Amino acid sequence: MLKGALTALITPFNENGSVDEETFCNFIEWQITQGIDGLIPAGTTGESPTLSHEEHKKVIELCVEKVAKRVPVVAGAGSNSTDEAVELAQHAKKAGADAVLVVTPYYNKPNQEGIYSHFATIAKAVSIPIVIYNIPGRSVVDMAVETMKDLCQNFKNIIGVKDSTGNIERVSEQREKCGKDFVQLSGDDQTALGFNAHGGVGCVSVASNVAPKLCAELYAACRSGDYKTALELNDRLMPLNRSIFIEPSPSGIKYAVAKLGFCRDTVRLPLVPLKDTTKEIIDAALQHAGLIKE
């Protein structure tokens, strides 16, 4: 069900900081016409930490309605409160999402038993497919491969992982422990090519907010074994992949999307707008990728 390039969607804001629903829906339509393979609303790139619960749920509802089953929608449903994560997953199911993306609990730093129990509780509470989101760089906890194996073996609705460890070896380890049908999606644009060569089936991409066509073509080439084409596409995208993370994300990718004319580059505090020097680097990366003219 899940493969290829799945965009970790930005959430556009109006000048007053409210969610720009019209722009969001228009942006989703453009993503689909560009050939994107799936969409992920209300995740980290969508500034979920600073969305209210009502806004979070509305963003998912808008996305599901606009997509209308044309591509899979994987709704962000993570929280460091297990009860809250259950509530968000239940809402995503009710809204019509195809799956949920659930991050490892951040800040409270549970051990492996706590991580297992968190996901087990969610899996028991909902029938919707669950994708684990393992991002130790932000959550400060790392789900062990053995924990992941136990979860996928014990709960059939835990179907895969968005792996943002940046550790290519993990792909082979998780493939060995969790099986070949366990969906492994890279969560790191910069290492995604190697990730897919090791057995991944795509990427939850930040860069695809501005380059959905290029990203979809890259992972289609990976799936067909055409790594010559994949490498050429990756070379075009790599400066962009790097530059959008010079400052805390999603400030960089929001600026890039705004540069293409889709939305404002407004982010919510504590995130702040980019420095001019960073904007210049992103501009050059967009030119290198052929997304804007010099």
Curated annotation (Swiss-Prot):
Pathway terms, separated by semicolons: Amino-acid biosynthesis; L-lysine biosynthesis via DAP pathway; (S)-tetrahydrodipicolinate from L-aspartate: step 3/4
Coiled coil region boundaries: none
The organism of origin for this protein: Bartonella bacilliformis (strain ATCC 35685 / KC583 / Herrer 020/F12,63)
Protein name (Swiss-Prot/TrEMBL): 4-hydroxy-tetrahydrodipicolinate synthase
Entry EC no(s): 4.3.3.7
Lineage: Bacteria, Pseudomonadati, Pseudomonadota, Alphaproteobacteria, Hyphomicrobiales
GO molecular function: 4-hydroxy-tetrahydrodipicolinate synthase activity
Keywords: Amino-acid biosynthesis, Cytoplasm, Diaminopimelate biosynthesis, Lyase, Lysine biosynthesis, Schiff base
Catalysis performed (reactions): L-aspartate 4-semialdehyde + pyruvate = (2S,4S)-4-hydroxy-2,3,4,5-tetrahydrodipicolinate + H2O + H(+)
Residues flagged as site, Part of a proton relay during catalysis: 44, 107
